[in-house]
Amino acid sequence: MPTIKQLIRNTRQPIRKVTKSPALRSCPQRRGTCTRVYTITPKKPNSALRKVARVRLTSGFEITAYIPGIGHNLQEHSVVLVRGGRVKDLPGVRYHIVRGTLDAVGVKDRQQGRSKYGVKKPK
C-alpha cells in the first residue's frame, strides 16, 4: 500500500487497453483500397500459397489482409471491407477481407458456411 505522500508524488497510472487490431481504431470493420494483391507462404510446418492484399484503410493505416475462400476477383484499386482476425500461420497478417461486400464477390459454388463467404442461399 502506498502512502499518501507517495500517491501525491506520482499518481496511479490507468491500465492501458492493448488492442489486437489497432488499424481499425475501435470500429468493427473499415473500408480500404487494395494497393497490391499477392501470395505469401505460411510458417514452418505448413505449405501453401496464401492469398493476401495490401490495403490502405480510411483510418490512414496500410495493412496486410487475408483473402479467405477459394478464388477471388480482387486486384489493385479494389475497394474492400476489412475486419479483424489474424491468420495463425501468416506472420504479420492480423486482418481479414469480408467477402460478398463492396468489390469482393462471394465464393463461387459455396454450399456450407455460406454466411462467412458472402454467398446467397441457392435456389
Curated annotation (Swiss-Prot):
Chief place of localization: plastid
CDD domains noted in UniProt: Ribosomal_S12
One of the record's GO cellular component terms: plastid
GO terms classed as biological process: translation
Subcellular location: Plastid
Molecular-function GO terms, alphabetical: rRNA binding; structural constituent of ribosome
Record InterPro entries: NA-bd_OB-fold (IPR012340), Ribosomal_uS12 (IPR006032), Ribosomal_uS12_bac (IPR005679)
Domain of life: Eukaryota
Family as reported in the entry's similarity comment: Belongs to the universal ribosomal protein uS12 family.
Assembly behavior: Part of the 30S ribosomal subunit.
Role of this protein: With S4 and S5 plays an important role in translational accuracy. Located at the interface of the 30S and 50S subunits.
HAMAP family tied to this protein: Ribosomal_uS12_B
Protein name per the record: Small ribosomal subunit protein uS12c
Source species: Cuscuta europaea
Lineage: Eukaryota, Viridiplantae, Streptophyta, Embryophyta, Tracheophyta
